[in-house]
């Protein structure tokens, strides 16, 4: 969020209340809108939302081929093109487009959760050693490089096979892949559509966190915070005091370069397709055009790199825990609960006006949220409960494990991705001192090892919305259900 959008808060007067958690701006709100825009949020969040969100989501509603509504989730805030938290589905058969601004530059930025059989009593005495060892094993910060050394030719296999490349090369357990969205591999990936510059930027970044809001966090299941015991058990969450590990990162410099490359291309070709947009940040091309397909195939390569990146990080986490606790990762039952993307476009079947359609669903700071009726797309153990959703909160307040519901059909099976910012990074740095924040967090039982103190200040808890209010809104809208709240005890910050 920048200062311009922060200053002007609150909804436009045309915003209509559909329910306590659904709000709508009609297609008549702005010239060019093809469908209404809907925001999933309670009144508290709506009143505090920056004006940029309402402007951007109504711009999205003007893109060719959009279906039903343009959506924004309760964690929504101003972004590039789409707001963060934006969801839109396009019908390729009706000229539906693909837009890098609806996916984000960090393609397949996503979340991963690893369970263990360790308890807080075992981990707390070693938390500093554990976090410091993880900091050494998983490089973080701008331009950091990973330990996996591969040739450009082998990197093509990473781009094609994603986390499945990791399985073939000793960085994954056989059970990991089934617990990743799309089994960790988007099949449409075509390395020939990725520029040399993008390849160069990704080549040495496997197994790295990067910077910004990316992190690796050790978390505790606290008594009273298990809301659905059956769903929790299916995910390997057995009771209070259990330790889990959360990872948040994406495709690093490679994804950014893919987005940059194709934004330029789309700005050049839009006149050829007669596309006019309300904001150049929404540059797009018809999905079925050669340029649209090229970007989709390149995006899939970056998404696969991100799946592989989180998998290599998981391998390193298992190694560090084995070293610190003197036990194998298998003995500690360090199983992958789930891995889910929240910056991506996916071809999915959805019902529009009673008719099944294959749509291109853009999720930008939004998570897929399949309910039990989409069982064929889920691991067998989750077919009765719905897809796990990993919702990252701030590093001071904690995170949530949720499940998707069939009610999420309302939003093209999409939900939020985190708490969402309320404050720009620049403002956070003005208001918070990183060293003081680090000390306060340690007093509150959270040991954090950060690359820079200014980067730590950017991610202070006060820079984010209250995750409880975000989750309340999701549940009230019927698109997500609480399973477990997780409390941070240690954090590696990029």
Predicted regions and their residues:
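Short, conserved catalytic or adaptor-binding loops enriched in Gly and charged residues
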Residues: 62-63
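Domain-length cofactor-binding catalytic modules of enzymes
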Residues: 2-56, 66-72, 80-84, 92-102, ...
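Acidic/polar active-site rim loop that often engages polyanionic ligands
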Residues: 109-117
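Patatin-like phospholipase
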Residues: 120
């Amino acid at each position: 969020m920048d200062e311009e959008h922060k200053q002007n808060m609150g909804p436009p007067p045309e915003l209509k209340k559909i329910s306590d958690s659904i709000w709508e701006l009609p297609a008549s709100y702005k010239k060019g809108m093809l469908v209404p825009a809907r925001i999933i949020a309670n009144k508290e969040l709506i009143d505090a939302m920056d004006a940029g969100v309402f402007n951007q989501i109504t711009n999205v509603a003007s893109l060719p081929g959009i279906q039903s509504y343009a959506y924004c989730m309760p964690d929504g805030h101003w972004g590039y093109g789409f707001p963060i938290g934006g969801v839109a589905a396009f019908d390729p058969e009706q000229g539906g487009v693909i837009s890098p601004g609806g996916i984000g530059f960090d393609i397949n930025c996503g979340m991963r959760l690893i369970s263990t059989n360790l308890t807080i009593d075992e981990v707390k005495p070693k938390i500093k050693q554990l976090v410091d060892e993880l900091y050494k094993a998983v490089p973080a910060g701008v331009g950091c490089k990973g330990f996996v050394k591969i040739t450009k030719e082998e990197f093509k296999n990473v781009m094609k096979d994603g986390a499945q490349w990791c399985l073939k090369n000793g960085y994954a357990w056989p059970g990991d892949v089934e617990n990743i969205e799309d089994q960790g591999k988007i099949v449409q990936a075509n390395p020939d559509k990725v520029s040399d510059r993008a390849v160069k930027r990704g080549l040495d970044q496997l197994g790295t966190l990067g910077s910004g809001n990316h992190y690796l966090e050790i978390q505790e299941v606290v008594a009273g915070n298990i809301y659905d015991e059956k769903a929790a058990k299916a995910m390997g969450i057995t009771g209070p005091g259990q330790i889990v590990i959360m990872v948040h990162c994406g495709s690093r410099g490679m994804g950014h370069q893919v987005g940059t490359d194709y934004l330029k291309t789309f700005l050049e070709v839009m006149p050829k397709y007669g596309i006019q947009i309300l904001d150049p940040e929404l540059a797009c091309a018809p999905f079925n055009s050669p340029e649209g397909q090229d970007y989709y195939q390149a995006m899939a390569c970056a998404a696969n790199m991100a799946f592989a990146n989180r998998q290599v990080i998981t391998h390193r986490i298992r190694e560090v825990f084995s070293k610190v606790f003197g036990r194998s990762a298998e003995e500690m039952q360090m199983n992958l609960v789930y891995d889910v993307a929240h910056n991506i476009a996916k071809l999915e079947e959805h019902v529009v006006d009673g008719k099944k359609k294959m749509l291109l669903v853009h999720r930008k700071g939004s998570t897929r949220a399949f309910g039990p009726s989409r069982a064929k797309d889920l691991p067998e153990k989750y077919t009765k409960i719905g897809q796990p959703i990993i919702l990252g909160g701030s590093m001071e307040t904690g995170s949530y494990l949720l499940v998707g519901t069939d009610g999420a059909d309302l939003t093209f099976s999409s939900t939020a991705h985190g708490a969402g910012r309320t404050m720009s990074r620049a403002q956070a740095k003005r208001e918070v001192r990183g060293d003081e924040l680090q000390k306060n967090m340690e007093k509150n039982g959270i040991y954090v090892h950060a690359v820079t103190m200014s980067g730590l200040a950017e991610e202070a808890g006060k820079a984010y919305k209250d995750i409880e209010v975000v989750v309340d809104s999701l549940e009230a809208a019927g698109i997500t259900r609480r399973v477990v709240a997780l409390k941070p005890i240690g954090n590696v910050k990029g």
